[in-house]
Amino acid sequence: MIETTAGEIAAITGGMLHDCAPATPVAGPVEFDSRQVTPGCVFLALPGARADGHDFAAGAVADGAALVIAARPVGAPAVVVEPLGAQTSNSDAFAHDPDGSGAAVLEAVGRLARRNVDELAEGGLTVVGVTGSAGKTSTKDMMATILRTAGETVAPKGSFNNEIGHPYTVLRCTRDTRYLVAELSARGVGHVAHLARIAPPRIGAVLNVGTAHIGEFGSREVIAQAKGELIEALPDAADGGVAVLNADDPLV
């Protein structure tokens, strides 16, 4: 993540500082697992199936996190954002979020990630997006391996491709990063578009349109519409946008 301060994070996210000086430096990435915090990072207080990150926030700061992004005061340096209320999305990210606390934290980190990628793009960062019903992760891994021969490359670990994993990955980009390979998943129309707004791609690849999550989508045609949101997010060809499409799949 680009070096910043607590005050700047509050301004970017629309949150309020609690127990934290505006000039507090933040130089690390974001982390949602309190066991994985590193010095200077931002801990994300997210509710989960078995635990609530808010309960681990003070411990995360004690272990080195610079501050917490939370939906309520946590007794530690924090940027506090207002809960957004229950979400209607079928995303797994909101499965254990009855009051929208997690949604508010994710919206905040999405804004922070967008600021990060916008500033880095001015310095030459290229964002490559990949989506499809199957093969996203292996294709992402191959792309990243190839691009690393040309410069520092950031890509999701495993299948970090949703509302949590995507901004988490984006905020691992630094001023030395030349390429970001973003894997974009969806369980409904609008999901890919949302992820693309966080890190606008210049190159986009749609691999295929299959039947994964067809119960949520309703038909392959709707899945095709959702995957096509990646291409809609690209700049015009005259401005450097590049679409890579699977000509063997008629729905692509």
Predicted regions and their residues:
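Short, basic phosphate-binding NTP loop
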Residues: I2-G129, T139, M143-T145, T149
